[in-house]
């Protein structure tokens, strides 16, 4: 039986506020699609994570008398902890502040720049 590769991702959730029902809903719907594809024998990868850049995060941190990094760490942890509580089967959780994410983005942008695009 031939397997097909499938890649599923939620939006990377913005950490300016705590997770809510909409985040849970999106994660569950994506999880259903990923599980179905695994059941069909497809090589399936399911990614989710958090976007930790932007003025709204700085503003939320300032309102709570903390740094944007400390605030993002706290809220990102809430998003990550939401997943097992909902039995979400994601393969990875990425944070836009993580070194591995930064390295990949730099590599992609360098390739684009070098190709003249």
Residue ranges, per PLM feature:
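N-terminal, positively charged nucleic-acid-binding surface of large information/translation enzymes
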Residues: 1-117
């Amino acid at each position: 039986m031939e397997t097909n590769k499938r890649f599923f991702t939620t939006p990377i959730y913005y950490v300016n506020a705590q997770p809510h029902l909409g985040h849970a809903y999106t994660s569950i719907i994506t999880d259903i699609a990923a599980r179905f594809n695994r059941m069909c024998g497809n090589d399936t990868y399911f990614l989710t994570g958090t976007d930790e850049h932007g003025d709204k995060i700085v503003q939320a941190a300032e309102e709570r008398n903390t740094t944007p990094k400390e605030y993002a760490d706290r809220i990102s942890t809430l998003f990550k902890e939401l997943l097992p509580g909902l039995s979400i089967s994601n393969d990875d959780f990425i944070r836009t502040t993580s070194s591995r994410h930064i390295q990949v983005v730099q590599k992609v942008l360098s390739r684009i720049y070098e190709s003249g695009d």
